[in-house]
Curated annotation (Swiss-Prot):
Pfam families: A_deaminase. Zn(2+) binds at residues 15, 17, 199, 279. Belongs to the metallo-dependent hydrolases superfamily. Adenosine and AMP deaminases family. Adenosine deaminase subfamily. The record marks 222 as: Important for catalytic activity. This is Adenosine deaminase. It comes from Lacticaseibacillus casei (strain BL23) (Lactobacillus casei). The lineage of its organism: Bacteria, Bacillati, Bacillota, Bacilli, Lactobacillales. HAMAP family: A_deaminase. The keyword Cell inner membrane does not apply. Substrate binds at residues 17, 19, 172. Its cofactor is Zn(2+).
Length: 339
């Protein structure tokens, strides 16, 4: 399939970070709101908000987020940001997206956890009112923060769970804060009924994936380090765990130093539930269409595969069965021409 055909395909995305996916025009708009000077050209601005091509590791990659954080400190800024990411997704025919963010990073301007979360929800509503897309939010705990901080965040935002805020995640410095360190906050979120996904296996540490699966988390973000772990892959399949793959991001962070270290083929061969994601559209300088093209070029991924992965995403989405059915029906209809 050529790029235009890939663009036209209906898509779903489970793993997309708000702060890592703002368009350059949105970043300029947000900076203007706080009188922050930016480079005159987009090429110069990109160098500040995109991960360097020669990132040495995940920590190096995450530095690109520092530039955007001060721009997301008001309700209006968070609304605009959420709307912007929904708009980008809708423009490449994403029919369902879950956008994740850490409300704790938007408190410097005096917002509360609830106000920050509500602002993102409002931005998603505005996006859905404008575009043909279903957009949901996930709140992220940050593994480098004390468990008490993450527990407070989940306790505070759990009452907002409903039609738009649908779940939670843990992101951040995995190398120094492995899964078992986060276990108390994970268990708190689970006890509150927060559906969870979880970043694991992004730093050559398969034990973090295994521990997340053991804790009953139904979705794993990245899971890169399972590529040469057949017993772990078998456990992923056995438990029905869904994997949120992020190819471009993993190559940038060196979570996968080569395509051979990316787990797609091993997971697919084993029958695991795979989904395709951007992770961070801006930081990784990618789109979901570009990700599809990379899978097609690297692995020979077909329209039949893409449909299956999108159906996996709908199955794993934190939404009611009625919404899943309507999305599945639409995907089958939209892919009928290609499969």
């Amino acid at each position: 399939m050529d790029f235009q055909t890939l663009h036209q395909l209906s898509k779903t995305e489970l793993h997309c970070h708000l702060d890592g996916s703002l368009s350059l025009s949105c970043i300029r708009q947000l900076a203007k709101m706080i009188d922050r000077k930016l480079p005159a050209t987009d090429d110069e601005l990109r160098r500040l908000v995109q991960a360097p091509a020669d990132s040495e590791n995940l920590g190096d990659y995450l530095k690109a987020f520092d530039f955007v954080a001060p721009l997301l400190q008001t309700k209006k800024a968070l609304q605009l940001a959420a709307y912007d990411v929904v708009e980008q997704a809708a423009e490449e025919n994403v029919r369902y997206i879950e956008i994740r963010f850490a409300p704790v990073f938007s408190l410097a301007g005096g917002l509360s956890l609830v106000e920050a979360t509500q602002a993102v929800i409002e931005g998603l509503h505005q996006g859905m009112a404008t575009y043909d897309i279903m957009a949901k939010a996930l709140v992220c705990g940050m593994r480098q923060l004390p468990n008490t901080d993450n527990q407070t965040m989940f306790k505070t935002t759990a009452p907002l769970l409903g039609s738009t805020l649908v779940g939670g995640d843990f992101a951040g410095n995995e190398a120094d804060f492995p899964t078992n360190v986060c276990a108390p906050a994970i268990k708190t979120a689970q006890s509150l009924g927060v559906p969870l996904t979880f970043h694991a296996g992004e730093c050559h540490c398969p034990q973090n994936i295994a521990e997340a699966v053991r804790l009953g988390i139904p979705r794993i973000g990245h899971a890169t380090a399972c590529f040469d772990q057949p017993a772990l892959i078998e456990k992923i399949v056995e438990t029905g765990t869904t994997v949120e793959l992020c190819l471009t991001s993993n190559l940038q962070t060196k979570a996968a130093r080569t395509l051979a270290e990316f787990p797609y083929q091993a997971l697919k061969k084993a029958g695991a539930k795979i989904t395709i994601n951007t992770d961070n559209r801006t930081v990784s300088n990618t789109t979901l269409t570009q990700e599809y093209q990379r899978y097609q070029q690297a692995f020979g991924t077909t329209a039949v595969d893409f449909l299956a992965f999108n159906l996996n995403a709908i199955d794993a989405a934190f939404i009611p069965d009625a919404d899943k059915k309507s999305l599945r029906d639409r995907l089958h209809q939209d892919y009928a021409t290609y499969c």
